[in-house]
Amino acid sequence: MIGLLLLFKRDMILGFHRTAKIFIIIVILGLFNFLYYLYFLHISLSKSNVAFWDIIGKTFTGVPFELVEQQTIEFPFGWIIFQLSGAILVNTFIKEDLFAHSAFIRVRTKSIFKLWVSKLLFCCTAILIFYILILSLTCFVWKLSGGTVNNLTDYGESILRYSSFQFSYSQIIVYSILLNIAGTFLFTFIFALLSLIFKTIYSFIVCICILFLSIFSDNPMLLGNAFMLIRHPMFGLSPVVSITMTLIIVPFLCIILLIVGGIYLSKYDLISNTEIE
């Protein structure tokens, strides 16, 4: 455990140093996505108060499948960016560090699996920091903008107009945020595993294709559907049960990906057959 903590500390220092520029870029993109809606709402709804959900809802809710069927879809660029934010942030860091420094660190730790786990722990930490920073800054600017309200507005209800269930205002915000964070975790783990086996660009394309297909199909096998609040329930009649099951299944899938990656690295000759992208 001490060895894992030391590796995690190393990855936190090295990882944030290597990914700082990309982190700043995706934070700016995320903020622009939300603050654009804040500006738009204050301009178009000048006589109405704006709720926090009004700002994040368009991005975090996903796309109603009814709009896809009607071919009146507004492509969810923001949702895709947030789902892929972990993969964008990590980029080639995991693969390059494993392949460039594996021989030295493997000898010291006597476990390539711990090195792999520490990399994924760094990913999870970076994702949480990203979401906390984005949401905190958005909330701060929202409060400063004035005309705020802490309940579901007419505009907020219009975002959920295709849903057949009713949540409280706080449930809507919490569930939508949790689902998006869970989706970012899962797609980052998928990307990290694939990038060990294939070129980074191919791994990224696979993740994009899964999300893209999820937008245009409500097939539950397409993982992106599970991370759109508007597409629930998927696994049961109750949306709360459905979301809870999703939040349970995601850690389970992440653990499977972690184990598969560890097995692959253990069997792969990291010293003699490496290729840094």
Regions found by a protein language model. Name each.
Residues 1-27:
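Aromatic- and glycine-rich beta-strand/loop motifs that create alpha-glucan
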Residues 15-16, 191-201, 266-271:
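Membrane-interface helix-boundary motifs at transmembrane edges
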Residues 25-29, 199-215, 275-277:
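Central hydrophobic cores of alpha-helical transmembrane segments
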Residues 32-93, 117-196, 232-251:
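Secretory targeting signals
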Residues 96-101, 127-131, 201:
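Transmembrane alpha-helices and adjacent helix-loop boundaries
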Residues 102-119:
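Interfacial "coupling" helices/loops that link adjacent transmembrane helices in transporter permeases
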Residues 253-277:
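Junction motif at the cytosolic side of a transmembrane helix
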